[in-house]
Amino acid sequence: MKKILFAAAFILSAQFVLAQPNEKYIAAMKKNLETMDAASKDPASLLALANQFERIALAEKTQWLAYYYAAFCQVNTGFMQQDPSGMDVIADRASALINSADSLSPNNSEISCVKAMVATVRMLVNPMQRYMEFGPEIETNLEKAKVLDAANPRPYYLKGENLKNTPEQFGGGCATASAQLKTAKEKFDIFKPASQLHPNWGLQRVDKLLAECK
């Protein structure tokens, strides 16, 4: 009986150790995160960064943040596309990556935010034709993100930006976006990421959108 208990304890201990991020992983992630702002100005650089995060994810296998950032970089290249014909391919890749993150960290507010972003890229291929299909998916993921973590400012930011970019005749514009953006700003003011590797993006964009809505 003691041997069985010892073996079970050993297995649990080994699983715990394997789930912990190692120093090499942390250093690689921090290096990539430090280049994200610069890379975000150029689709090719952002795609290269997505590939770097994916390589980290494949090497580590148990760290959801590497898959998360790979998906985040990938989906943001979709928003930068001039030709909508390639946006579905980008969304497919981002979706696969964020689903891998979801399998490692289910019911995660940050992951739901990126899922909403992926659905937004799909909708932007042809908003008039695709809104009925992807609009509810965007909304569902953003509302889920709010429920999963009430302190997370990003679902409010993403909702506000979506509303700002929606024509007024369809219920959008600054008048409806401002409430979401102001809530996002309030939450950003007190938000503290769980670690230096956890998501902490969006504040600068919220400030810019609020300034545009004055």
Please place each PLM-identified region on the residue numbering.
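Bacterial Sec-dependent N-terminal signal peptides
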Residues: M1-Y25
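A charged, solvent-exposed segment within the mature domains of Sec-exported extracytoplasmic proteins
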Residues: M117-T183
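Terminal, low-structured helical/coil segments at or just beyond the last alpha-helical repeat
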Residues: G172-A179, T183-K214
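Amphipathic alpha-helical repeat scaffolds of TPR domains
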Residues: P21-M36, A59-Q81, N107-N126, A151-T166, ...
